[in-house]
Structures are given as structure tokens and as C-alpha cells.
């Protein structure tokens, strides 16, 4: 059976940053890219808030850069999906989807989190072309334009108020006849003049053409449908961490995110570390994920030094 010092699962900013640091520490990391090579960023058309790219860069191009850097220092990047981790003893036995098994002295989980979508075909069609699940990431591109936010909780209200500072008009599409957000967030929304809350509305279809989103068709709870022209459509109905692999093996919080020891990447299982959105329900930013990937690699290196 193949044996490795450090196995990294996930190929977003957290995974590849962990790989860069682990490789430079002579841990000869093996990284499995998973179901979505490059992570969520590959669906982002333009990134302007990651340090080092003053002119901006596409998500795919940035992830290609990170991948090349990790490979340059000796990371073994592999295509494949990890199907199981036996955490009962160390080295951990990790099973790949092709049936191969690997013994890993340390494992870094960087499998990310996925935004929840409505499930509309048109929504997926325009993903990255006007449909987004991150106002902080993409709102800047819709300055002085009309946009919509779907959701009724704190996140949706935060996204709407943020977009209102950039956009001409923000429509907050709420399925229920009330907001679920905190009182303070509700007041902020209702006191922002360019936010219009559309209660008891559902999204029937995202409209667009070859250039991207052009509008949305809404359906009231009474069945009436109508269209609104807009340029951006933001989902704020939550995220779910990609933790199916470690459910029942690592401590997870009530939302399913991996619990780490404060200030570290250490999980409830010695020798397994977590980085990026899989353990971060709050920030979900590429730069934060990259930083946590660095922390995970350093923690793994120190763990190996202490367990020689």
C-alpha cells in the first residue's frame, strides 16, 4: 500500500495553499482534486479582491496559477475522489474512488462548501454570468445596476444591504410573508430606500441571453407571474459544507461544518486538519481559505515532527 506523509483532499485556495506550504516543508504532499477541480472559484468570472492581481483575474486562471505553484514545489496532484477515510488508527487508510488505498500520516480536509441553489435549469445556465452566491465577491460588477437577492434570513439581508451601497435598485425576493432575519437586520433593510422587499414571491425563471442575466420571472403565491429586468441574481439561501466524507468521524457543528480547535486547523481526530470553507461558516472568502490552508500545512508539519 502506498504511504504518504500528507494527503490533501480538495483543490480550492485552501487545498492548494496547504499543498504549497507542505511541499516546501518536504512533506511530499499528495492532493486529490475531487469532484470540482479548482473549487468554487472556477465558476467566478472575475476576481478583484485577491492580493497580487491588481488588474483582476478570472477564478479559473487564479486556480491554474495556484496549481502550477503547488506542482512546482513538488505536490503530486491527482484526479479522483476520496471515498472513505478510516480514522480508527494512524496512519489513516484512505480509499480512492478507483479502489486504490493510501496510508496517510496526516490528512488535510479542504473540501469546501457549496451554495444552495433553487434548482432551476436557468439558474445553472447563467451561473457565473449574472447568477452568484456571493455578493461580496461579485457585487462590485453591478454598480449602478438593478439586482435581486433571494432569501429572507440574516445572510440575505446582509447581502441586500451591501448591494444597496453599490447598485441602483435591489429586489429582495422572499418566499414567506415575513423576514426570518434578526430585528436589527430587518430594520436596516426597511430603512434602505433602494431595497424593495417582495414578500410571498418565488423565482419561476432566471432570464438572459448570451451575454448573461437580463431579468427574472417571478411568481406570486397567488399564481400571478411577472418579469423584472435586472443584471444580477444573488442566492442567499445558505451553504452546506461538503463534509459527507467525515460525517460521524469528526466533530461537526449543528450546520455540519468541521469543528476546529480555536486558532488552529486541528480537528477532533489527531492528525486530521481542516482548512477553508469546510470549517468556515462565516467568511467564505478565497483569501481567508488560502490563509487557513497555510495554517493546516504548518499544523500538519508540527504534528509530524512531534510524532516521529
Tell what function each PLM region has.
Residues 70-89, 93-96, 101-104, 165-262, ...:
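A Rossmann-like FAD-binding core segment of flavoenzymes
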Residues 12-13, 36, 113-115, 154-155, ...:
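Residue-level detector of alpha-helix initiation sites
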Residues 3-5, 79, 143-145, 200, ...:
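Phosphate-coordination loops involved in phosphoryl transfer and adenosine-cofactor binding
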Residues 288-304:
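An active-site-proximal "capping" alpha-helix that borders the catalytic cofactor pocket
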Residues 4-73, 145-146, 157-183, 190, ...:
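Beta1-alpha1 glycine-rich phosphate/pyrophosphate-binding loop at the start
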Residues 77-143:
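Glycine/small-residue-rich loop that forms an oxyanion/phosphate-binding "nest" at active or ligand-binding sites
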Residues 119, 124-141, 237-283, 292, ...:
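FAD-site-proximal beta/loop scaffold in flavoenzymes
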Amino acid at each position: 500500500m502506498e504511504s504518504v506523509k500528507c494527503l490533501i483532499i480538495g483543490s480550492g485556495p485552501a487545498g492548494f495553499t496547504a499543498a504549497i506550504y507542505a511541499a516546501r516543508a518536504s512533506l511530499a504532499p499528495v492532493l486529490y482534486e475531487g469532484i470540482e477541480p479548482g473549487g468554487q472559484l472556477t465558476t467566478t468570472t472575475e476576481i478583484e479582491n485577491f492580493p497580487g492581481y491588481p488588474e483582476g483575474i478570472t477564478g479559473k486562471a487564479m486556480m491554474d496559477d495556484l496549481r502550477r505553484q503547488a506542482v512546482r514545489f513538488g505536490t503530486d496532484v491527482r484526479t479522483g475522489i476520496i471515498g472513505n477515510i478510516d480514522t480508527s488508527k494512524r496512519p489513516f487508510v484512505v480509499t480512492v474512488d478507483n479502489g486504490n488505498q493510501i496510508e496517510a500520516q496526516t490528512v488535510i480536509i479542504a473540501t469546501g462548501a457549496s451554495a444552495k441553489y433553487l434548482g432551476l435549469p436557468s439558474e445553472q445556465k447563467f451561473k457565473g454570468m449574472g447568477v452568484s452566491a456571493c455578493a461580496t465577491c461579485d457585487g462590485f460588477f453591478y454598480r449602478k445596476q438593478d439586482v435581486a437577492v433571494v432569501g429572507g434570513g440574516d445572510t440575505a439581508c446582509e447581502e441586500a444591504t451591501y448591494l444597496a451601497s453599490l447598485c441602483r435598485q435591489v429586489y429582495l425576493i422572499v418566499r414567506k410573508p415575513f423576514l426570518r432575519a434578526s430585528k436589527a437586520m430587518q430594520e436596516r433593510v426597511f430603512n434602505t430606500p433602494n431595497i424593495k422587499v417582495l414578500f410571498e414571491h418565488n423565482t419561476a425563471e432566471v432570464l438572459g441571453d448570451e451575454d448573461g442575466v437580463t431579468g427574472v420571472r417571478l411568481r406570486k403565491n397567488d399564481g400571478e407571474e411577472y418579469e423584472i429586468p435586472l443584471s444580477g441574481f444573488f442566492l442567499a439561501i445558505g451553504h452546506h459544507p461538503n463534509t459527507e466524507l467525515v460525517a460521524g468521524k469528526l466533530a461537526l457543528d449543528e450546520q455540519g461544518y468541521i469543528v476546529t480547535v480555536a486558532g488552529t486547523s486541528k480537528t477532533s481526530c489527531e492528525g486530521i486538519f481542516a482548512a477553508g470553507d469546510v470549517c468556515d461558516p462565516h467568511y467564505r472568502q478565497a483569501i481567508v481559505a488560502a490563509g487557513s490552508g497555510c495554517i493546516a500545512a504548518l499544523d500538519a508539519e508540527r504534528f509530524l515532527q512531534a510524532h516521529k
